[in-house]
Amino acid sequence: MGFRRAMALAAVFVTGFILCGTLAFQAVPAAAAETKTGVGLSEHALMAYRDGWKYQYGNYGQYTNGVRSTDCSGLVKSYLWWRGNDCDPEPNLVSVAGSSQSMLSSAKVKGTIRLSDSSTLPRIHGLILYSPGHVGIYVGGNKSVDNRCTGENVKYGDVIGGNYHWTTWFKLPQVSYPENGFVTFDGNQYYYENGQYVVDTSRTIDGVTYTFDHNGVMSSSN
């Protein structure tokens, strides 16, 4: 009886340990959700363009016949819902407005684009570009990425002087945009001041002089 009682107590102890371990494990807070950034959105958009994603209404980056596809707002959602290259995005991983118009309506920071005036387009990676019924992504250097034509690939082209009439830019509320300091985008260095990357200028920072070209890319340092 003594042996059996000892075994029973041991079983209770082990069970309690496992349960406590489980409870303790469950009590550990999950890692904070990845911060979504304007630079990250721009990198994601370029990836979609370079990988040949297709247009499919209602999609947000799912694989179809071995190729990912989205519609215009789905391209934005695919970044917010991204879980990696080996799986489909997870809908509602981040709460976001559904359509291009509702995305615009949800934005608190926005402005008008005049295609004859490049100064009306802020130098900010990851801005959302809007035209009635359509959205795209600004990736800097006067370039946009968007998905608009059934069966065709993601598009890449000029904003000012391009063949698509963008009317409005806005900041997506779910995305954090650069304010000050260096950022790396597509393998190049940019320097932000007061919320925009600098162009056609030099800056001396911590004793080092950096030169930035007309697209904002750091071209030299000494």
Name what the model sees in each region.
Residues M1-A10:
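Bacterial Sec-dependent N-terminal signal peptides
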Residues A24, A33, S105, S119-T120, ...:
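Extracellular adhesion/carbohydrate-binding repeat motifs centered on closely spaced tryptophans
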Residues T35, V39, K77, N85-Y156:
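...with weaker cross-activation on analogous glycine-rich loops/strands in unrelated enzymes
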Residues R83-V96, P173-P178, G216:
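Short, well-structured beta-strand/strand-turn elements
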Residues G162-P178:
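A recurrent domain-boundary module in secreted/ectodomain proteins
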